[in-house]
Amino acid sequence: MIRSFLIMFSCLWFHQSAVAFPTERFPIPPASANRLFYIQRSSNANTVIYDANILPNKSLNPNQPVHTYWIRYADNGQKEELNLIQRTLAYGLYTNKIKDEINSFEGYFLAYRKRKFVVKLNAKNQAIALFPINGKLQILERVFVSVDESGFTPAVNYIELFGKDEVTNKDVYERFKP
């Protein structure tokens, strides 16, 4: 489990740089109406994006409710699909329709199953990802992962979760060590 988690947040085969970037120095991905959240890592500026996969009828795609891809800031800022290994071991998601709820899916990261999330359309018909932050399902907006690459196998120093309370819309934050 720990090994899978390390794979998820380090993806050694794509590390471009060992230079650490403070959280505030990372580029902010361009806004998108379908944006759920994104992940950035201390290893480089490349960003994994998680967007809701909305059909023309304004519902979530039941076969793939979330589209995951890179923005390669460390290269030329181009958009790039995840490769098979990244999709199935590292950054990919498992999702399953929640019975008796319209446009709602539960899921987890394939590499880290300890925290399950919900992807759904809210009352304003906007896609959101609810993720456990401080023990409560909150709207997840971004994730930052601090990675120590000094050893043979990278280790996760800590993970920061940034989001909003679904009811109050106040900022929420959690930092934890996996």
Q: Model segments located where?
A:
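Serine/threonine-rich low-complexity intrinsically disordered regions
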Residues: M1, A20-P22, P29, D51, ...
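N-terminal export/targeting and maturation segments
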Residues: A18-L84, D171
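Mature extracytoplasmic domains of secretory-pathway proteins
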Residues: V66-Q138
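Arginine residue identity/basic-tract feature
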Residues: R3, R25, R35, R41, ...
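Extracytoplasmic electrostatic interaction patches
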Residues: K114-P178
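Bacterial Sec-dependent N-terminal signal peptides
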Residues: M1-R25
